């Protein structure tokens, strides 16, 4: 039985982590933490997330006390602000914990991105070099040996899973940049209240065009330029991305289907559609990324959908945990 700690358990993604790890047959949640200024300190998890009443009744502790339990902890999940994770990761690594970081703090190879997009100077360049990017379907061999797994962003997960096979097989026209329109539910902005995410204000609207934090992540990990246009949608959870690309001549639908099948046939959390297209409804509260496509002439529109809190966050983190420790990839997830 592995002892785990979850930091940031009061947030949406953190709560999903608690749910998964509570069900995990080979893990024991030793402690759950919230920030030092949180109003939830000393409250029960089930008081904050009432759907877990009499299921998970662990008590929140302040992050200040996490230094007291560093012994006998096998793994830690960080569902925290980027700057908080930036500071906590070295501490837990020095305590011989395997770290699964859901923030962006260790995703990127280029530390300049953190100043340009996240507003802080990254102080641990060596850890950036040694972290393993936790796109579970593509990095399993590296994840098996990693001490620091940096989980991808929610948008970045959905978009990469849709595009990587086609880029890998070199079927996209080099002269045309993929154009990505993606819509996320308001839970992607976190649990903290804000006017833009309030019931009467939320709408369908684009935001942070060319400046979204996931843009450099997507470009770096795909290795090709893209135009990424994120949108906030009037629903609570889920992401749907429509990606328009130009194909090289004579690429047919059967070729694309065979490519997706080649890479994802034995990947239980990827579902490929042959006749239909994914929707938010098909992935809401599910740990899958669903992918479909339509081709006309030399153009392809790929549609990918996931739950931003699950495959875009907690489910992928637990998937990486399972891979790292040699469990079934879907243990406690499905």
UniProtKB/Swiss-Prot annotation:
Family per similarity comment: Belongs to the NAGSA dehydrogenase family. Type 1 subfamily.
Alphabetical list of InterPro entries matching this protein: AGPR_AS (IPR023013), AGPR_type-1 (IPR000706), NAD(P)-bd_dom_sf (IPR036291), NAGSA_dehydrogenase (IPR050085), Semialdehyde_DH_NAD-bd (IPR000534)
NCBIfam families referenced in this protein's UniProt entry, alphabetically: argC (TIGR01850)
Protein name as catalogued: N-acetyl-gamma-glutamyl-phosphate reductase
Enzyme Commission no: 1.2.1.38
Domain of life (superkingdom): Bacteria
Stored PROSITE patterns: ARGC
GO CC terms in record: cytoplasm
Entry-linked Pfam families: Semialdhyde_dh, Semialdhyde_dhC_1
HAMAP family per the UniProt record, alphabetical: ArgC_type1
């Amino acid at each position: 039985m592995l002892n785990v700690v979850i930091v940031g358990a009061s947030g949406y993604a953190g709560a999903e982590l608690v749910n998964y790890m509570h069900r995990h047959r080979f893990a024991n949640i030793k402690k759950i933490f919230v920030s030092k200024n949180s109003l939830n300190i000393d409250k029960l998890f089930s008081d904050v997330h009432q759907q877990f009443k009499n299921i998970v009744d662990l008590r929140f502790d302040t992050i200040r006390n996490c230094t007291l339990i560093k012994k006998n902890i096998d793994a830690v999940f960080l569902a925290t602000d980027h700057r908080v994770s930036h500071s906590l990761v070295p501490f837990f690594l020095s305590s011989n914990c395997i770290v699964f970081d859901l923030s962006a703090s260790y995703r990127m190879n280029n530390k300049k991105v953190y100043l340009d997009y996240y507003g802080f100077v990254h102080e641990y360049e060596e850890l950036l070099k040694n972290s393993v990017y936790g796109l579970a379907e593509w990095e399993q061999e590296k994840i098996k040996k990693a001490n620091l797994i940096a989980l991808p962003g929610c948008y970045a997960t959905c978009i990469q899973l849709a595009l990587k096979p086609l880029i890998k097989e070199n079927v996209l026209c080099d002269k045309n940049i993929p154009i990505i329109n993606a819509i996320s539910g308001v839970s992607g902005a976190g649990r903290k209240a804000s006017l833009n995410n309030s019931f009467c204000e939320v709408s369908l609207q684009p935001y942070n065009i060319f400046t979204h934090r996931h843009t450099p992540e997507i470009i770096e990990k795909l290795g090709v330029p893209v135009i990424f246009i994120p949108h906030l949608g009037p629903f609570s959870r889920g992401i749907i991305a429509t990606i328009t690309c130009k194909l090289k001549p004579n690429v047919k639908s059967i070729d694309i289907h065979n490519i997706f099948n080649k890479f994802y046939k034995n990947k239980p959390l990827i579902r490929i559609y042959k006749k239909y297209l994914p929707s938010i409804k098909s992935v809401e509260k599910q740990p899958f990324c669903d992918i479909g496509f339509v081709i006309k002439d030399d153009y392809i529109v790929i549609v990918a959908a996931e739950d931003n809190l699950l495959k875009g966050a907690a489910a992928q983190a637990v998937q990486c945990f399972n891979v790292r420790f040699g469990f079934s990839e879907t243990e406690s997830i499905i």
